[in-house]
Amino acid sequence: MPKPAIKTAAKPATSSAGKRGKPITPKSVAKPQAAKPKTVSKPKVKPGEKKRLHPRNLHINGYDFPVLMVSYPKLKAFVRPTPYGDLSIDFADPSAVKTLNAALLQHHYGLAFWDIPKGALCPPIPGRVDYLHYLADLLFEGGKVKRAAAIRALDIGTGANGVYAILGHQVYDWQFVASDINPQSLTNVQRIIDNNPSLQGHLSLRRQQDDKAVFKGIIQASDRFELTLCNPPFHGSLKEASQGSLRKVRNLQLNRGEQPKATSATLNFGGQAAELWCQGGEKQFLATMIRESQAFAEQCLWFTSLVSKQENLKPCYQALEKLGVDTVKTIEMQQGNKITRLLAWSFHSQAKRLQWRNQIVSGT
């Protein structure tokens, strides 16, 4: 099936603050003179109205279950009516969520095959593709967003699902390097690639050997990336991750009007250890990422990451200010009741960013 068409959307509201003068290079660090980065102002939302997905998001109006069930018949077994007269699935059931994802990836994004092993993180497709749409806006800086096969992106911590790299290529034709510390995760992503001709030759995989590193050992001397992206491990320990999963299951049961009764045996928010938690949690992971980014400043146009906990933004801004980065932007995203932030930074001036991007897109 043809890949999704791209419509031009208005530039997302962001804020930026930057150092005037030459961008920092990995070999020399000037004293930061930039004003402290500012967070993006919260979008004005009418009372009772939720912030919607990105305007280009195919799922902005929810899931069309009747169409999906025709396109992907396996989904029928998991769809049931809600008390409000709509159709839905049990989002606490990993098999239901995985089947919905497979249906979405086939119907909307042209995948012939997608699967993950039991216990692996099963991400919601609308939220994942939202990140990519905002990255496209970031890269084109208010101009017309174009599909461009020359754009290279690095997905840090791709997991067993590989959805960022998969969606990034299917929607925007970007080329991806996807990294992970778990060899089993990479094996599964390779299986997905092998079963989808549209992905072959466009996604390459690299294993991170050092559990305390982010970019080191992954970015090679000859690499140049227009974008890096990451959804960091959220929790700081296995216990914390388990408690978080239990809360999610209970909240789903309450939303359905059920009596909370989840136990460890019914924690269906899948996720291997490296996908859900790391020592120090999201805060430490982001600190390492920011620190390491300086060494690869000339090889990457934009570094980006999701930030789930708002309180982790301040230490990120402080660390970026110390490095003297040229530009820092924060974009708020929301899917349902979940709010997250896209943090982006570049060591390059706007003029240099536009020159870099235009050379890549035009092929000169």
Swiss-Prot record:
Query: According to the UniProt entry, which residue ranges have a biased composition of type Basic residues?
Result: 39-53
List the EC numbers from the record: 2.1.1.181
The protein's location, in the record's own words, is: Cytoplasm
Q: Which Pfam families match?
A: Methyltransf_10
What is its EC class?
A: transferase
MF-aspect GO terms: 23S rRNA (adenine(1618)-N(6))-methyltransferase activity
Q: InterPro entries this protein is in?
A: METTL16/RlmF (IPR010286), rRNA_lsu_MeTfrase_F (IPR016909), SAM-dependent_MTases_sf (IPR029063)
Where on the tree of life does the source sit, at the highest rank? Bacteria
BP-aspect Gene Ontology terms: rRNA base methylation
Q: Which UniProt keywords apply?
A: Cytoplasm, Methyltransferase, rRNA processing, S-adenosyl-L-methionine, Transferase
Q: Where is this region: Disordered?
A: 1-53
Q: Which GO terms describe its cellular component?
A: cytoplasm
Quote the catalytic activity from the record.
adenosine(1618) in 23S rRNA + S-adenosyl-L-methionine = N(6)-methyladenosine(1618) in 23S rRNA + S-adenosyl-L-homocysteine + H(+)
HAMAP family to which the protein is assigned, alphabetical: 23SrRNA_methyltr_F
Q: What does this protein do?
A: Specifically methylates the adenine in position 1618 of 23S rRNA.
Q: What family does the Swiss-Prot or TrEMBL record give for this protein?
A: Belongs to the methyltransferase superfamily. METTL16/RlmF family.
Recorded protein name is Ribosomal RNA large subunit methyltransferase F
